[in-house]
């Protein structure tokens, strides 16, 4: 791990948290973000990506930006004429921002320090227990979402370091950027696993209940349609019977 403070171009993300190990493509349209990418492409391709606390500010202030983010390597930049640029990055490591420089009219910068995540559980039994809890939660989540879990579980089982395991599982299951940021910012490895497993279980429960609600709605609609069909049949039958009575009276 490098304890050196490194000054990197900064991109604040709206509604997104990028984790170490993630490879992701996203659009950028703000002038400072585009300039940050251009600068990074000329200087080792590295940039500090951190989410804004809320997506609304176009130029967020210090208290509107999280302090924990991810140092990423830019893999590809596609410039779309008259539109946003598409940037593909790979998350390298977790870093904390010791200072933000937001006054520059062209580019925002962050003074970053890498966070040491090389440690983990000291007890292998505890590690394996937590990993099995997470894998079971991932399997339940995938089943509740209609997603095949085999490849995800197989990939998780190959990851040796504890933090990397958490980030991979988080990226596969949790979309909420604030949850991702909470997991990223948490230093204690057991707490990371707790937040992750609890969040995945909660998502699986939501998916299950969503299916229950959908099934209930479909049943009610089916009953209403059946009732409507029966009522229509009765109405038509009454009209036909009424028509026959009138004919008899005319005779």
Show which residues each predicted segment covers:
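N-terminal low-complexity, acidic/polar interaction/targeting segments
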Residues: 1-251
């Amino acid at each position: 791990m490098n304890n050196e403070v490194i000054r990197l171009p900064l991109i604040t993300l709206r509604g997104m948290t990028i984790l170490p190990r993630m490879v992701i493509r996203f659009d950028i349209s703000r002038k400072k973000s585009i300039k940050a990418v251009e600068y990074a492409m000329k200087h080792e391709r590295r940039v500090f990506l951190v989410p804004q606390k809320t997506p609304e500010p176009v130029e967020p202030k210090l208290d509107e930006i999280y302090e924990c983010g991810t140092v990423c390597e830019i893999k590809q930049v596609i410039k779309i004429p008259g539109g946003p640029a598409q940037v593909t990055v790979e998350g390298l490591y977790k870093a904390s921002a010791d200072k933000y420089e937001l006054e520059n009219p062209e580019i925002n910068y962050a003074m970053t320090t890498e966070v040491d995540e090389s440690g983990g559980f000291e007890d292998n039994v505890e590690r394996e227990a937590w990993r099995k809890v997470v894998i079971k939660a991932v399997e339940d989540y995938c089943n509740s979402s209609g997603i095949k879990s085999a490849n995800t579980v197989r990939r998780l089982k190959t990851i040796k370091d504890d933090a990397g395991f958490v980030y991979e599982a988080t990226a596969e299951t949790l979309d909420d950027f604030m949850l991702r940021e909470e997991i990223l910012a948490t230093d204690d490895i057991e707490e990371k696993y707790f937040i992750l497993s609890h969040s995945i279980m909660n998502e699986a429960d939501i998916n299950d209940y969503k299916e229950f609600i959908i099934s209930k709605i479909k049943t009610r609609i089916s009953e209403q349609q059946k009732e409507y069909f029966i009522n229509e049949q009765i109405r038509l039958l009454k009209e036909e019977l009424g028509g026959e009575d009138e004919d008899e009276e005319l005779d």
